[in-house]
Amino acid sequence: MAEAYQIQSNGDPQSKPLLELYVKASGIDARRIGADLFCQEFWMELYALYEIGVARVEVKTVNVNSEAFKKNFLGAQPPIMIEEEKELTYTDNREIEGRIFHLAKEFNVPLFEKDPSAEKRIENLYRNFKLFLRAKVEFDKGKKEPSRVEDLPAQIKVHYNRVCEQLSNIDQLLSERKSRYLLGNSMTEYDCELMPRLHHIRIIGLSLLGFDIPHNFTHLWAYILTAYRTAAFIESCPADQDIIHHYKEQMNLFTNQRETLQSPTKTHTIPEKVLSDIRVKGLAPDVNVH
């Protein structure tokens, strides 16, 4: 039923709670991680607790269509978290977030620092992207190649403009703060929310929309590069093929067999020109061009 990704414990394992996170499996291969954003978000938060020795963590992929899963979890959908020691199963996102929050607070882990400015910049980014995605996919139906943004009708271009405006605002915030993460030099809940969504926007933009995050948003790209060098993100990130398959299923788009047979790959590099600009600004001087 489940493929386990065990994060080894630091120190005395018996003194720390064991948290089992069940995440949705890939629609291509049930042994691989699926592209559910909330699953990755909670995985990253739990990884942050593991890294400093607060908790033991096991992550298991589950095929939500299997009879074993339906029987064991009675219709609940991933993410699901189990804390066996307390005989508790958390099936609601707010319950999972609440348990992680209390653990972080108990051990003084600054994972849930509140920042209205950062919150305002990132809220609705993904919603606006989904509106753009749905509108453009519908417009491009029957076309061999995605249409160019400049050729889109005004009612679709408005969604594109909103996405770019929000990306620009995040780029500006990062420029002002001069920090690796949104709130400073440590990852917080805002990064666990934003990093996976930016990655999905990038992968789906390039594969389905003929769209890329504007290359002049240098501080935003430096932030994306930080994601690609953050263990919590790397461990929890699905393959490109699984992200694309996830959205094609949502959009009812045809997936040919060749795509499902491809070896899984993960895009964790950025364009050379962008990387060069990042170096010039001294944002990541130790990174080599790929």
Swiss-Prot record:
Compartments, record wording: Cytoplasm; Membrane
Gene Ontology CC terms, in alphabetical order: apical junction complex; apical plasma membrane; chloride channel complex; cytoplasm; lysosome; plasma membrane
Entry's Gene Ontology molecular function annotations: chloride channel activity
Bilayer topology: Single-pass membrane protein
Keywords of the record: Chloride, Chloride channel, Cytoplasm, Ion channel, Ion transport, Membrane, Transmembrane, Transmembrane helix, Transport, Voltage-gated channel
UniProt KW Translocase keyword: no
Annotated GO biological process: chloride transport; epithelial cell development; regulation of tube size
Effect of residue 46 to P: Abolishes membrane localization
Tissue expr: Expressed in the secretory system, hypodermis, vulva, pharyngeal muscle, rectal gland, tubular rectal epithelium cells, and tubular neuronal support cells in the head and tail.
Sequence intervals crossing the membrane: 37-57
Domain notes: The N-terminal part (1-55) is necessary and sufficient for translocation from the cytosol to the membrane.
Family: Belongs to the chloride channel CLIC family.
Subunit comment: Monomer.
Biological role: May insert into membranes and form chloride ion channels. Involved in the formation of the excretory canal. Required to prevent cystic lumenal expansions in the excretory cell. Not required for formation of the initial tube, but is required for regulating the size of the tube lumen as it grows.
Protein name in the entry: Chloride intracellular channel exc-4
Species of provenance: Caenorhabditis elegans
Organism phylogeny: Eukaryota, Metazoa, Ecdysozoa, Nematoda, Chromadorea
